[in-house]
Amino acid sequence: MRVSPQSRLTLVFILITVFLDIVGLGIILPVLPGLIRELTHESVTNAAVIGGYLVFVYASMQFFFSPILGNLSDRWGRRPILLLSLVGLSLDYLIMAWAPTLLWLFVGRILSGICGAAMGTATAYVADITPKEKRSQRFGLIGAAFGLGFIVGPVIGGELGEFGPRAPFYLAAALAAANVVFGFFVLPESLSKFRRRRFNWKRANPFGALWAFRHAPVIFVLLGALFLFSLAGQTYPNVWNFFTIEEFGWGPAQVGRSLAIFGILFAISQALLVGFATRYLGVTATVIIGLSLAAVAFIGVSMIHTELGLWTFLVIGSFSGIAAPALTGLLANNARDNQQGELQGAVNASNSLTAIIAPLAATQLFSFFTDNPLRPITFPGAPFFAAGLIVAAAMALFIFAAIKFDLRHRPFDERREKPRYPQPSGQAVNPPETEIPEDEDGNGDEAEAEAPATKN
């Protein structure tokens, strides 16, 4: 099947859109402390608390608006949602560059979270235009654009941040605006009117996907382990900038470069090491090794006082990236084929929850143990120490699941034949169809054909 030039251009647009969204998230990390302090004249620790609230607002908007925008795109099409979200992102970057008060920073983060929630629509667009046999490859390109954006974003933010904390946002605004113009001319609608369905608030509920697996203990427990691991992992983007400024006196450029190096090594571990580890060590061992590396890295970063030691533990932590894909693979292998979409929705909802909880918890810990008069000790690394304990809890939960549900040391594909659900004696291994709730109209996940309205 030959790919038309138009199809190539639309795919390029989608990849640029995902890339710019993540670049916008990464840009703010190195310059956020300086921008907050410029507006508030607060100390680094107080700026960290404010930064936590800003990230909390952003993550909350993404969590609640992702399913809403996804369902709106099912009703009105992908093109308008994507183009409007890019217009909103461009406006957000201009607001962040201009913001005369802290209130306007919050306005910008709210707008960014809402518009960034449309990235799920970008994935849906790729699914619309791609044959089933090529979807994994195309989704891999989206993942690559995501990873590249997180690497490039902190570098741009750090380097341009040397000219002032607002400088990176002007570049981001210009790039987003240029992509709007590009998309206006090259992006056709991918969802025909006959494949659309009515907007439904039940489908737009972000908690629905998690609740759907309450009767599948093995998946619920593994989701719990993944939730804890992801919660700990949020410490890096939320506290690393404030921690390195306070403890080592780093500037925006050093913060940006360190996050970029971490992102590169983390991506390498996920792209190259996961397959090797699961093939020769098994999935269970791979998860345990990855969690162990994460726990050691977090505890080490919290205790170390030299830059050499900091870089050493940062490198160790980057290789913990093998844990999440292996754990996600175990989750997928313990769900039925027609539950994979629901499962990934639950995983995304879980990750979004960690992005809401972690900013407040981590920055409050950092502030308390750095300059609060009631602190028992001065310990700027407290959030990383807490993250190490959380990873240890995730490991304990995973080991419990491995023993309880017999998650043996096997590569992913060897377990696909036996989804593990509790079954009454004499019943099939697969769970009944009623486990995953249907839409209110009883159509499940099937699209409703557009037709003239009729009344009974």
Locate the predicted segments by residue.
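Juxtamembrane intracellular "pre-TM" segments in multi-pass secondary transporters
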Residues: R2-S7, P188-G224, E247, E417-S425, ...
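Short amphipathic helix-loop junctions that connect adjacent transmembrane helices
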Residues: P30-A48, N238-V255
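Conserved MFS/SLC helix-loop-helix module at the cytosolic interface between two early adjacent transmembrane helices
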Residues: F63-L102
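Helix-to-loop junctions at the C-terminal end of transmembrane segments
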Residues: F64-G77, S269-V283
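Cytoplasmic helix-loop-helix junction between adjacent transmembrane helices
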Residues: G108-G147
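A membrane-interface helix-boundary motif in multi-pass transporters
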Residues: G161-A174, Q364-V391
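Multi-pass alpha-helical transporter architecture, strongest
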Residues: V180-V186, F385-Q423
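C-terminal transmembrane helical hairpin of 12-TM major facilitator-type secondary transporters
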Residues: T284-L327
